[in-house]
Amino acid sequence: MRRLREYLRERLELRLRILRLLRVAGLRLVGGALAFQLFAGLAPVAFILATSSVVGRVPTAVEAGLDSPQWQSLQNALLLAGALFVLQQLSWPFQWAAGELVTWRVDDAVRERVAAASFEPVGVGALEDQQTLDELAEIADPQRGLGLSPGTACAGMLSLVSRYLQWLVASVFIGVVYAWWAALAVALGALAVRVGIRSGVGRLGAFEESFGPTRRRRDYYRDLLTSHDAAKEVRIFGLLPWLQDRYLARGLDAVQPVWRARRRIVYLPYALSTPVWLLLSGLTTIGVARAAAGGGITLGELAFTLQGIVLVSSFGSFFFESDWQTEHGMRAFGALERFESRAASERARESGAEDAATRPRFGIRFENVTFGYGDGARPVLRGLDLEIPAGRSLAVVGLNGAGKTTLVKLLARLYEPQSGRITVDGIDVREFPAAAWRRRLGAIFQDFVHYELPVRENVGFGAPSLLGDDARIHSALTRAGALDLVEQLPQRLDTILSREYEDGAELSGGQWQRVAIARALMAVEGGAGVLVLDEPTANLDVRAEAAFFESFLELTRGLTTILISHRFSTVRRADRIVVLDEGAIIEQGTHEELLRLGGRYAELFHFQASRFATGEEPE
């Protein structure tokens, strides 16, 4: 019983919280939508009263004749009933439109909250957590139905006003016109069925929620079938049938258990409560018929009571305009609240207020840093100690999987070390506000983003505050060797870098890399003091990559520069080179020192050089 009370209390509190979202829809709109719902709740009762009045007046009007006042009264009652019917039909489109507007405005606000919460965490680890991904999928799952969202939940709750009003007012009129025991019996019977249906919907929604990971896998297959990025491989390797089978299989895995559970969760409560409703409604109807036969009520009262019983009984049903919308919308809103809470707790960990504006002045240090992706995962970095002097260039080399990119992610505070710390000029990097520290970093990763936006934004995103400064954007493009490329595009800086848009252009892998490098150099224009290139030139051949790095080091002389590469021959001009292997530094020094050492660097350098000499591309 205590668990039931807690469940009901939580559901009520959630409903109240989601109703507060109506504030973002605007008082006038919500007031208008509520007025339409009040009319929708009262109009059917008024129509029943009017038609019952027509039925009650027919005998006397027929007896009195066509020219009698009784006949005129019958006509007036008939006109009133017709007018009420027409008004009900005319009000429906406005009622629907008001609900849609409420939905759109609330969902717009929810999308803004999702976006804001997504940027709350300092790093990206929270966005890779399975629980977080399930919550985000719950907030906005395009396959769940016809737009079941917090906005539809708000509109659905407003529509409940008319349903409950019909049930209450019709019950009261039955009590006034006929008998209170009859009103109570019919109202309670309908309420019993309604409670059974609604509780079943709630339990079914909770059961369906447990299939979040399955739905995410289904959606992944769907995206592979429809995405531009995967289209070439999907067709070349003939993956369409396989993906279609997997998509359908995962879709069935997500819905078949729900279909089977529906009989037990929804239909069983309905089957148990329906006999109660049938018994109470049947006894009431028999009582009304006997009263009419004995002259206890008039013909008009009989007509109203019978129609009233039907109207009250309709309350004991599934509400197509609100039940699924409210249930899934509330679950989506609950997921949003949990996501916001987790994001806020991540943000709360950042309490630093140190000024990062001129850092680093002396250097950056990794002190005994250990990190792995996920609890219990094998460490990618193990007890890493590394010093990066300010104003110098450092190359980090190693085979794929050595932990090079992870090192950069920790430096950018996309993740936090599991042990050890990173310091800037002797200050723990966590003492700097994350946004302020990142403004001092210009980092381009190997999987940099290809924005389907104009060249101006693709470069200018390196320093958003300079997006309107075309001179600096041109300067960054020139230094990256990409200005000639941009000058050949149809709209130059305004050309959208995607063939999916009119006058858009598709770049090759090497061309995209030069645009990305210009983005990093733009960050320098915006005040970045640390520049990181994480193999953004992997699509270039060895000679082009080596030439670029030499030119790049000249351009960035005086900056703290970190170059990541698995090609040992391309970074020889760096002031210092460290060799990373299985998450630990095994060698460091200049190119010449490492060759004289004759260790791992020298071995892999000569191995890659020999492959290059024989015409093979070094890995």
Question: Which residue ranges define each predicted feature?
Answer:
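Membrane-integrated ABC transporters
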Residues: 1-44, 63-77, 95, 131-169, ...
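An intracellular "coupling" helix at the cytosolic face of ABC transporter transmembrane type-1 domains
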Residues: 23-27, 140-153, 213, 226, ...
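Transmembrane helix-loop-helix hairpins at lipid-water interfaces of multipass membrane proteins
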Residues: 31-94, 164, 168-201, 279-300
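ABC-fold ATPase nucleotide-binding domain signature/coupling loops
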Residues: 136, 379, 483-515, 521-536, ...
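Cytosolic ends of transmembrane helices, especially the final helix of ABC transmembrane type-1 domains
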Residues: 239, 305-341, 471
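Helix-to-loop junction immediately C-terminal to a conserved catalytic motif
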Residues: 412
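ABC ATPase nucleotide-binding domain helical subdomain, centered on the C-loop/LSGGQ "ABC signature"
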Residues: 421-423, 456-502, 558
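C-terminal portion of ABC ATPase nucleotide-binding domains
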Residues: 550, 558, 567-619
